[in-house]
Amino acid sequence: MDTAENLLLDRGYNGFSYRDISNALSIRNASIHYHFSRKTDLGVAIIRRAKERFAKWSESMAGKNIGYLKKLNEFFLIFKKYVEREQQVCLGGALETDFKTLPGEMQEETRIFVSIMLQWLEKLLADGRSKGEFKFVGTAKDQALLIIASLQGAIQIVRVTAPSCFASTVKQIRSCICA
């Protein structure tokens, strides 16, 4: 599943096949079909695994006695790792790009995954603003959407420019919301 996820992040869902996975792992296609009879099943499994990872991560953040800005910085690191890993895009960005061509099951899982991340960030921003750590115009929901869209866009732009574009984006986000 790791190989399939990496291919998805590099090429998009429509940019790889079971043959690409089997070639990378030096196995036969039948071995993959044994575990995932359809590519859709593999895609759904990748998204569900990502949701589980984010749930564990967000639980760990809830348990940390650190400020809201530090939690936001930890959130930025989730996206930064894609820039550092051979300039991959994040899972949300990869799936959103292919969304109209994804099977229905994957579309639904993608909606849920993106919604979970947006809700977590919205709550962080609302709580941080109520405690005076963040200051921004508009609702926390709108700000969360702006931040995630900016991070995903920065990851895309890095592919054709330089990794410093991601750092510049994060710097600008911080300057726009820090009290």
Locations of regions flagged by a protein language model:
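Amphipathic, non-transmembrane alpha-helical scaffold segments
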Residues: M1, I47, K51, Q107-L118
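Solvent-exposed, amphipathic alpha-helical segments
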Residues: T3-D10, W57-S60, S150-I157
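All-alpha amphipathic helical-bundle segments outside canonical DNA-binding/catalytic cores
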Residues: E108-F113, S130-L146
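Amphipathic alpha-helical segments used for helix-helix packing
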Residues: E84-E105
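Helix-turn-helix
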Residues: T3, L7-D41, A45
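C-terminal peripheral helix-coil segments that are non-catalytic and often amphipathic
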Residues: K70, E74-Y82, S115-Q119, K123-D127, ...
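Hydrophobic alpha-helical connector segments
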Residues: A45, R49, E59-V89, A140-I147
